[in-house]
Amino acid sequence: MQTQIGPEKRPYGRSTLIPFTTESPITARLQGLLPLLGTGGGRISASVYDTAQVLRACPPSSGVTPGLEWLKRQQQADGGWGSPAAPLYRRISTIAALLALHQYADIIDATESIEAGLEHLHFQRELWANTVPDSLPVGAELIYPYLIDEAARLKLAIPRQGNTALLSQGRKKLQYIAHIKPDAGSPPMHSWEAWGTDPEPAYLDGAGSIGHSPAATAVWLARLPRNETTNPLRQQAEAYLSRASRVTGFNIPGVVPGIWPIDRFELAFSLYPLLIADLLGHPVLQDALEPQLDTLGFALTEQGIGLSDHFYQDGDDTAAALAILHTAGYLVDPAVLDRFRGDGIYYAFGGEIQKSISLTARAVHALRLFGLADQTAVRLLLDSQGENGRWHDDKWHISWLYNTLHLILALAAEPRGATAVMHAQDDLIQSQHSNGGWGVTGETTPSETAYGVLSLYTLHKENLLTEAGRRAFKRGQAYLETAVNQPDLDRTALWIEKELYVPHRIEKMFELSALLTHIN
């Protein structure tokens, strides 16, 4: 249990809080959303890949037709699945969808869909043939070869394009998995469907899943013998898949997210924008906020915090929780972050091959709030900035705007960081869309606009915001006011998993928080 200290001792009081009233519609929406954070295991978008795997390996008892029809509706005009604006994340989803439609060819007419998908795969350039970016889909080095083998087994003509770098990385990951012998709730379990063979009962975690992955859980169930001994395990896993199908907003049996539950991740990452916007002390929010802060404090252990209580602790959620709780006046120990520190980089989990610039920035930001500094990490962040002022190629998010926000939080107060963040500010101003928003896929999105607004707000607090930056801030807020009511199912997926996804409540918290910021 964490100990709370008085508000007069809260260490992060640089900005004056704005006296909103309960009549403020944005404040009222925050009051309504705060108690929902983490409930129901978290709210997250549906996954083409995981849905296809569930339909193939563990079809719902009510039938597969609604799920297959949903899969068909997700196909893009060019024949592939996933956003054409983010081609790196399409191949795995496309192959998985084709396998599912091919398997059920006698149930649903998908001939045209399959032909279009195969044609798409033949013409889509293999984007990780020679190099493997840090922004690779989660587990791709294992999942892609597995899907190709599945296609060959089912006699589906999936083209085998050059992927030397990816296959090499996959072999390294398999060696690592064999060495560590992963257990329930560990990161390798999240891709168990691609490397596992024996459905060990001990692999089932406290959520009733294999690695919080519907795909892995479905394949594990398909390989689990049916007998009296395994029936209780089967019931737990089937109940998990049923619950997972109810959190995407579609409510179609078998249509599932790519990762779930995410209750601790949703809570930590949803409260983080309140920290950025200096709203943790907002008097009107306290009745709704304090129980959630207590929940986060109870969940943070000496080992950190994970995306749920049944998954390994990770550096990203831990850094966010430490920053939030310390700022809110809780007694927490920043040394918890030490176990996630590498040589100038911070990791989510041990054994990771790709690095995360946003996670490292969040850790540096958290340490700064404690009055601490990791100068090696600061130097890495500074050296990682591109000539255009951006930080690209992150492990967990495809938008450079997400990176820019976290890097500005980490570097704006650093003596060596002024030049870098001013360069980033110039790029933010120049890249703002004509409607006042921001977006990296060719369209403006509310969440990315919130990152831009909060970046400029942070620069304002450090007396680094230019007049052009002030104008960009006001234009960004004006756009957000018109876009904040965007329906969840219409959101652009920008967060990286086995495919791109949307954590609905987290994005909404960023947007509402950005609307409540103010510059003089």
Which residues does each predicted region cover?
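Nucleic acid-processing catalytic cores of prokaryotic defense/repair systems
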Residues: 77-81
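Alpha-helical repeat scaffolds
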Residues: 110-120, 285-290, 337-339
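Repeat-mediated protein-protein interaction surfaces in helical alpha-solenoids
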Residues: 29-38, 191-204
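An alpha-helical repeat/solenoid feature that recognizes helix-turn-helix modules
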Residues: 2-5, 9-22, 40-66, 83-112, ...
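Buried hydrophobic core positions in alpha-solenoid tandem helical repeats
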Residues: 71, 121, 241, 292-296, ...
